[in-house]
Curated annotation (Swiss-Prot):
The gene is dut. GO terms for biological process: dUMP biosynthetic process; dUTP catabolic process. PANTHER family: DEOXYURIDINE 5'-TRIPHOSPHATE NUCLEOTIDOHYDROLASE. Pfam families: dUTPase. This is Deoxyuridine 5'-triphosphate nucleotidohydrolase. CDD domains: trimeric_dUTPase (cd07557). The lineage of its organism: Bacteria, Pseudomonadati, Pseudomonadota, Gammaproteobacteria, Alteromonadales.
């Protein structure tokens, strides 16, 4: 069952100068977000900037959240990644989606108006409950942490 989530277009260039966000294929998990800036901007090496997307959101359903993820080509080809690595949008957030862009490369990068810079996807949320305990049952795996299961 699909839960309808309404995204509000708050920048009139979306749908006119630039296409509405869409899923590229029937199997696409995310849709691209664009840089809805007023003029092209240079992001210097190591600089982080906050970029408006022209889209506002209110998920409203507490069993869902939105996440903003990087586009692989931006990071691999240009060193442009999300400044916070992943943006988590809680169901009760209401407002414009902003993208924190970080230039991790050693070269300036020019972000043009309407460039696709991140992607948005929706995920289910399960909220945990807590129980105070005196002991915890062990398992075959045990408490091994990072790297415990090896690489082979």
């Amino acid at each position: 069952m699909k839960t309808p989530i309404e995204l509000k277009i708050i920048d009139s260039r979306i749908g006119n100068e630039f296409p509405l966000p869409a899923y590229a294929t029937p199997g696409s998990a995310g849709m691209d977000l664009r840089a809805m800036i007023d003029t092209a901007m240079v992001i210097e090496p190591s600089q982080t900037v906050l970029i408006p997307t022209g889209i506002a959101i209110h998920v409203a359903d507490p069993s869902l959240a939105a996440v903003i993820l990087p586009r692989s080509g931006m990071g691999h080809k240009h060193g442009i990644v999300l400044g916070n690595l992943v943006g988590l949008i809680d169901s009760d957030y209401q407002g414009q989606l902003m993208v924190s862009c970080w230039n991790r490369s050693d070269k300036p990068f020019t972000l043009e108006i309407g460039d696709r810079l991140a992607q948005l996807m929706f995920v289910p949320v399960i909220q945990a409950t807590f129980a105070v305990v005196d002991e915890f049952n062990s398992s075959d795996r045990g408490e091994g942490g990072f790297g415990h299961s090896g690489t082979k």
